């Protein structure tokens, strides 16, 4: 009897191992040993030694998974069930970057480009079309060279915002840069999508302040602004990341900041009625404040308890000047907020970037060297959506939104003010189009942890259903025809390409269909700039080598007309 049980357990173990092996093998799209050996040999021949191959029975997997997971910021895409790259390449020079692209092309691999790994939908780390793919991770290409005399800096694509800010501050205490607040976001992708932040009402987006770039295209050419031509240079600034080539470096314009700036984060929790009245007044004030002022709101529903608070509201303010000036401006324009001197802190610009960062325990810290930290400790699962608002939302409309927000303790909504320089820059100046007429942008966010992800009562599906409900509820109150969205807050719910079109093997009709299919999300992200972006894509990447689920396809019918030329 015992022998039979033992044999049964051994058989069961073998079956489970076989199932596990079969499941794991499905995570990596089929690739022959010959093909795998080809790309490995190619990389070695080009002296690219820093790469890791998907582990097989002959290769240990720790280094591969450590490298893969290091930069995945949204844990939804680090799950075991997600497809894995065949190879992860970490180039350490522009020559190695060029060689990496050529080796991927030689092996017919899809290419995923990863700078900081903050892609909201995991497009820098995952591919879902079933083809073998490679991740080219730029983490070693993170240099920042600042030239104060010319008020410019060359920033490699793998540098983070925090590394960039820190390098600028070491060179000058009266210069800064306009980009986002999360220091671990990669510069390559952030600027490719626009890059909105605390200085944007004064100086525009990160992409508005790019004066040159170095782009590795699908043929392995390293192109500067002159070589790529003005149409491509226009497209890569705000036209989305991962679809034009690989940004080796941006040349950015340094921006003047005073030695003293003012920062504050003021909580204003309360009833839905109280918060809705504050938000209603905020939307009338924040877009019209001086260009030097940035005032945003974040809201969430508190965890259920005995405290009679329905909504947590938090106002984050930044002013290019002293706190005396900041308080005077706000008390005149927004007295309902009740800002006091004790709420505000004077600091340097670089200290303000730390103050507003998502790094732990920085509220009372002045150790700005922490901005150089690349690894983000507080990773989570999340899903996000975005909107733009052109006309003020009524108190009743805000109340309706807060009723939905109240349902989900893990839900958040962030309101970012526009106006200022964003109002004056033309929507055709670069590919990012959301300018005149926008009062503010909205980011909807739901965030959960591992314990929540495995909750039988409320799994990740429940969280995603909630944010979709929130988004649908807001439809009457936001932009329409099209309902605009911010490409850096990528949302695959807006639509995806059913297949990844390769024009060289497709008909003109199917290629044209792909362009119209992509228009569904393309016009939400890029408005009237979409067709111009299609032409730029056809010119720089006619074979659609750089692509993902929500990319911009080339127009096959015009391939001959747009055969690459910088003229």
UniProtKB/Swiss-Prot annotation:
Mostly expressed in roots at low levels. The lineage of its organism: Eukaryota, Viridiplantae, Streptophyta, Embryophyta, Tracheophyta. Involved in the biosynthesis of pyridine alkaloid natural products, leading mainly to the production of anabasine, anatabine, nicotine and nornicotine, effective deterrents against herbivores with antiparasitic and pesticide properties (neurotoxins); nornicotine serves as the precursor in the synthesis of the carcinogen compound N'-nitrosonornicotine (NNN). Catalyzes a late oxidation step subsequent to the pyridine ring condensation reaction in the biosynthesis of alkaloids. Keywords: Alkaloid metabolism, Disulfide bond, FAD, Flavoprotein, Glycoprotein, Oxidoreductase, Signal, Vacuole. Its cofactor is FAD. Its EC number is 1.1.1.-. It is an enzyme of class 1 (oxidoreductase). One of its GO terms (biological process) is response to jasmonic acid. PANTHER family: OS08G0158400 PROTEIN. Disulfide bonds join 42-103. Induction: By jasmonic acid (MeJA). InterPro entries: BBE, FAD-bd_PCMH, FAD-bd_PCMH-like_sf, FAD-bd_PCMH_sub1, FAD-bd_PCMH_sub2, Oxid_FAD_bind_N. Belongs to the oxygen-dependent FAD-linked oxidoreductase family. Pfam families: BBE (PF08031), FAD_binding_4 (PF01565). GO terms for molecular function: FAD binding; oxidoreductase activity. It is found in: Vacuole. One of its GO terms (cellular component) is vacuole. The keyword tRNA-binding does not apply. Residues 1-33 form the signal peptide. This is Berberine bridge enzyme-like D-1.
